[in-house]
Amino acid sequence: MTNNMNNYPLLSLINSPEDLRLLNKDQLPQLCQELRAYLLESVSQTSGHLASGLGTVELTVALHYVYKTPFDQLIWDVGHQAYPHKILTGRREQMSTIRQKDGIHPFPWREESEFDVLSVGHSSTSISAGLGIAVAAERENAGRKTVCVIGDGAITAGMAFEALNHAGALHTDMLVILNDNEMSISENVGALNNHLARIFSGSLYSTLRDGSKKILDKVPPIKNFMKKTEEHMKGVMFSPESTLFEELGFNYIGPVDGHNIDELVAMLTNMRNLKGPQFLHIKTKKGKGYAPAEKDPIGFHGVPKFDPISGELPKNNSKPTYSKIFGDWLCEMAEKDAKIIGITPAMREGSGMVEFSQRFPKQYFDVAIAEQHTVTFATGLAIGGYKPVVAIYSTFLQRAYDQLIHDVAIQNLPVLFAIDRAGIVGADGATHQGAFDISFMRCIPNMIIMTPSDENECRQMLYTGYQCGKPAAVRYPRGNAVGVKLTPLEMLPIGKSRLIRKGQKIAILNFGTLLPSALELSEKLNATVVDMRFVKPIDIEMINVLAQTHDYLVTLEENAIQGGAGSAVAEVLNSSGKSTALLQLGLPDYFIPQATRQEALADLGLDTKGIEEKILNFIAKQGNL
């Protein structure tokens, strides 16, 4: 991809924020226009996150214009909105490689740039990390400023409010910017509100406010009256949210128009010199400046390559995704059972729950970015006699580990976890790979863990988990299913595998959707293939039979080898006193970088060719075949 920089005369001059700060203020609107157009052109040719970045163009320009980055430290929450930040901080020419193998990261990444203060990917971490960074700077008398940018979705998480509460108590100098990108600018975001916000963010108001507090502290009745007066003024002039953040110890300003570059620069210039925790609430429009994205910000959140002129996203006419298979199964169950409840922590579209939410709104809950609450909410529903199904990405279930153990498993409650994005997820990289769920769930008593090899088996396992009356998890990958015929639902025998092919000497014990590679290899190696189905309880009887009748056992999974399904097989062999040679194939002991799924599997030696090479090398080391 090459962008014609003749179309971007100002942007072509910007190779770092230092270059940006050389511009006159009256040049900033043109720069914003060019930056937005460049972002659209780039992402349309490479794929990636689009709508969020389009909405933060003015904010990004204003922040780097006012603050002396990287000396002043700027922290982006999640990172979807940070593409303009990457473009302005020396990575413009590398945008063609974003989310690709060996390319720049889709999120801010410390190893990539000194301007990326915090590596991110998951939500709601910015304020906690920012507070720690601000405290460290304060103790070192560094004189640097700390700014955290968090979205209206991410700030709903409990972790964000824990950090706000702590920051208010410490009274540390830092600025939190709430990027509120609802569908439209609210009524009170206009010239008057911007003017009032400039007054409240100014140094004169701040000095008078702090000085009067010192005096009035000695006269409690007057102090309380003035405090209530100030709160009333802010409540009238600003939004109801101001009271909440003021009570947490922040000086709240806003909401203000996040697309007015002149006002943002003036506001941030004022706020840069204020002491204590500051909170700036800006209103932006997701997809700003590109009509199709403004109309459908969810559809244009993450996009494949597309034609920016037509604005039409390519349709997926291939096999259904595992997410759709799950969503269809959930609808099928809801038609028969009013007690089934579908729950998602802000992943309705990604988890395939759109149709379910529309057809069965009373049986659907989107609890926002609140994974811990999600799991314990499901616990309560189960106690109340309902049948909760938690649809959650593998990487996000990590955030609710204590709730999984303490609230679900210890009480042995019938909560079904539909774990999407298990295994290699591809372009989103290390923060989103579903590499650890088998390992961290396998050690939990009462858990049933299932690994389908295709979409029909996935449906049967979901049904089995729904019917079993215990904590159960079904893990399935991102992307398209195999294309097998779907059969009527029936409960699988728990803890039992199925023998697919009988061979000699080598037995491949498959856990999950790498089964096609195992079957392809079995013909060449005359290997036995078993679809293990259950990681827990594991089929001990089958493992012992295979160990007695074969020279080599090979376990195959898309999970970390350490603590994974292969480790469960090793434990069975050890406890049974079997000495059969065991090769465990899975994800290695490092974080898997971004690449397509096919590229990643090839690099890891988990494609058909790589698996064959690993098996043959293992046997060669053992001495014979």
UniProtKB/Swiss-Prot annotation:
Complexes and interactors: Homodimer.
Keyword tags: Isoprene biosynthesis, Magnesium, Metal-binding, Thiamine biosynthesis, Thiamine pyrophosphate, Transferase
Function: Catalyzes the acyloin condensation reaction between C atoms 2 and 3 of pyruvate and glyceraldehyde 3-phosphate to yield 1-deoxy-D-xylulose-5-phosphate (DXP).
Organism: Haemophilus influenzae (strain 86-028NP)
Top-tier EC class: transferase
UniProt-annotated binding residues for thiamine diphosphate: 80, 121-123, 153-154, 181, 290, 371
Cofactor dependency: Mg(2+); thiamine diphosphate
One GO cellular component term noted in the UniProt record for this chain: cytosol
Cross-referenced PANTHER family: 1-D-DEOXYXYLULOSE 5-PHOSPHATE SYNTHASE-RELATED, 1-DEOXY-D-XYLULOSE-5-PHOSPHATE SYNTHASE, CHLOROPLASTIC
NCBIfam families: dxs, PRK05444.2-2
Catalytic activity field: D-glyceraldehyde 3-phosphate + pyruvate + H(+) = 1-deoxy-D-xylulose 5-phosphate + CO2
Family membership noted in the UniProt record: Belongs to the transketolase family. DXPS subfamily.
Pfam families: DXP_synthase_N (PF13292), Transket_pyr (PF02779), Transketolase_C (PF02780)
Sample GO molecular function, one term: magnesium ion binding
Highest taxon of source: Bacteria
CDD domains registered for this protein in UniProt: TPP_DXS, TPP_PYR_DXS_TK_like
Enzyme Commission (EC) number: 2.2.1.7
Co-factor note (free text): Binds 1 Mg(2+) ion per subunit.
Ligand binding (Mg(2+)): 152, 181
Protein's GO biological process: 1-deoxy-D-xylulose 5-phosphate biosynthetic process; isopentenyl diphosphate biosynthetic process, methylerythritol 4-phosphate pathway; terpenoid biosynthetic process; thiamine biosynthetic process
The protein, known as: 1-deoxy-D-xylulose-5-phosphate synthase
InterPro entries listed in its UniProt record: Dxylulose-5-P_synthase (IPR005477), THDP-binding (IPR029061), Transketo_C/PFOR_II (IPR009014), Transketolase-like_Pyr-bd (IPR005475), Transketolase_BS (IPR020826), Transketolase_C (IPR033248), Transketolase_CS (IPR049557)
